[in-house]
Design a protein with these regions (language model features):
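A helix-coil-helix interface module used to build multimeric assemblies
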Residues: 2-203, 208-214, 221, 277-278, ...
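A general structural motif at alpha-helix termini
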Residues: 60-61, 217, 262, 273-275, ...
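Acidic, glycine-rich loop-and-beta core segments that form the ion-binding/anion-interacting portion
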Residues: 217-305
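Alpha-helix capping and helix-loop boundary segments enriched in small/acidic/polar residues
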Residues: 105, 110-113, 157-164, 168, ...
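Glycine-rich cofactor/substrate-binding loops
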Residues: 2-38, 99-100, 267, 282-446
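Short amphipathic alpha-helical segments with heptad-repeat character
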Residues: 119, 123-130, 134, 141, ...
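A short structural micro-motif
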Residues: 62-70, 231-234, 391-396
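Charged/polar positions within long, soluble alpha-helices
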Residues: 44, 48, 69-76, 94, ...
Length: 446
């Protein structure tokens, strides 16, 4: 059985070990590639300050690239009795290279090592989320343009209110995800700062070159203060979780709209048949299960910042084992959101709209404001026009054509989709993922 990195002469109680390790080995498999990348940058820096020879560096880099390849293929495992990914990587190096493998931990603690792994993992996941959101955005904008002339009822208080359009409906969610991307971008910028070299949270007496590892790993800058670098554990995850929750909030609302509009009482849209399921007793049913599950998953994701906050709440500065538990709720959240984005993008691309909703006279009163505005434009004081139309409605005399003439920015007749698309493009460019990708390729020799 492998010796633990921290092991002394005291016998380990197996029940206590099981309790303290928990799901950490399972979660650490997500971090394996990133642990290797971090180690490659660290040992390159160690060689530059004389703690490794050039020959040792060459051997270590070659073996680390082999380990990375196994992780990339899904073949990397954390062996029984090995408590985390850091221990497994060091064990593999030591088995293959002997004492050289034992040198890679110089100037490093598992505290800054796991923080680095999490940041490398998280920024990669943020990139994938951003790409998925951008795909959804393009579908929404395209559908907004496609159906820009198709009117639908707008609601307030779930009461029919004013004319809207499918152009506005699709476009509203398109602009919403642009704002969501701003939160994601802010989270990325906070994440993309290098904690390596903070060690256990108080630095090292080794002359570490933290600027070098920052460059090698493609970070924007450092977490300069070593105490803050460790204090950022939990805070970084919470900030990212808030960005994920913001995106999830938009998708949840969209899913609710679509489920409601798909029901027979509304009949505004028709969801793809392959995204609905039947009933075991009612042969006519087509239940919007995919969007119902999407809504539930997104609502769960919206609780994630609170979960992380409660785990890290009331901790003083320094490292505490409490922080390990955050991984269990944080790491799986990315795939859950990506799944929801994939389903939503597919459904919104395939959804069919009812182009004749307003043929039903029950929607006639949504044009009451149009009539008030017409009278006001002709010179009648607005309040008098409002009263007249109200009396006509009460007397059953109200009538109005089923057309609208809105021209101001963001209205039915002027959706501003080009301007919204420009905002999205500007936001996407603001991430600047190129630096991290090029840095990791350079370390891997690709």
């Amino acid at each position: 059985m492998a010796q633990k990195l921290w092991e002394k002469s005291v016998q380990v109680n197996k029940d206590i070990e099981r309790f303290t390790v928990g799901r950490d080995r399972e979660m650490d498999l997500y971090l394996a590639k990133h642990d290797v990348i971090g180690s490659m940058a660290h040992i390159t820096m160690l060689e530059s300050i004389g703690l490794l020879t050039k020959e040792e560096l060459v051997q270590l880099l070659a073996e680390l690239r082999n380990i990375y390849a196994s992780a990339e293929k899904g073949e990397f495992v954390i062996e029984e009795g090995v408590e985390d990914v850091h221990s497994q990587v060091e064990l593999m190096l030591t088995r293959r290279l002997g004492d050289i493998g034992k040198k890679i931990h110089s100037g490093r603690s598992r505290n800054d090592q796991v923080l680095l792994d999490l940041k490398l993992f998280t920024r990669t996941q943020i990139k994938e989320i951003a790409e998925a959101v951008e795909q959804l955005f393009h579908v929404l904008v395209n559908q907004s343009e496609r159906y820009k002339d198709i009117l639908m009822p707008g609601y307030t208080h779930l009461q029919i209110a004013m004319p809207s359009s499918f152009g506005l409906w699709f476009g509203a969610y398109a602009e919403s995800v642009v704002d969501d991307m701003l939160f994601l971008q802010a989270a990325f910028k906070m994440c993309n700062r290098n904690p390596l070299g903070s060690a256990a949270g108080y630095g090292s007496s080794f002359p570490l070159d933290r600027t070098m590892t920052t460059r090698l790993l493609g970070f924007d800058s450092l977490n300069y203060n070593v105490v803050y670098a460790q204090m950022g554990r939990g805070k970084m995850e919470r900030n990212v979780a808030f960005a994920l929750a913001t995106i999830a909030g938009t998708i949840s609302k969209l899913a609710f709209d679509a489920c409601m509009f798909n029901s027979q009482n509304f009949g505004f849209v028709k969801l793809p048949d392959d995204c609905t399921t039947g009933s075991s007793i009612m042969p006519h049913k087509k239940n919007p299960d995919v969007f119902e599950l999407t809504r539930a998953k997104c609502n769960k994701l919206q609780s994630l910042p609170q979960q992380i906050m409660m785990i890290a709440n009331n901790l003083p500065s320094g490292y505490f084992r409490d922080l390990q538990i955050i991984k269990e709720v944080f790491i799986p959240a990315f795939q859950e959101l990506k799944d929801c984005l994939q389903m939503t993008t597919y459904i919104m691309n395939e959804i069919k709209v009812n182009e004749h909703i307003l043929d039903d006279d029950k929607y006639l009163l949504i044009f009451s404001v149009e009539e008030v505005n017409r009278l006001a434009r002709e010179g009648m004081p607005f309040r008098d026009a409002y009263k007249k139309v109200g009396l006509d409605i009460e007397a059953g005399k109200f009538s109005h054509g089923k057309e609208v003439h809105h021209t101001h920015e963001g209205s039915i007749g002027n959706l501003c989709n080009a301007e919204i698309s420009a905002l999205m493009q500007q936001t996407v460019e603001g991430f600047n993922f190129c630096g991290m990708e090029e840095a990791e390729k350079a370390l891997l020799g690709r």
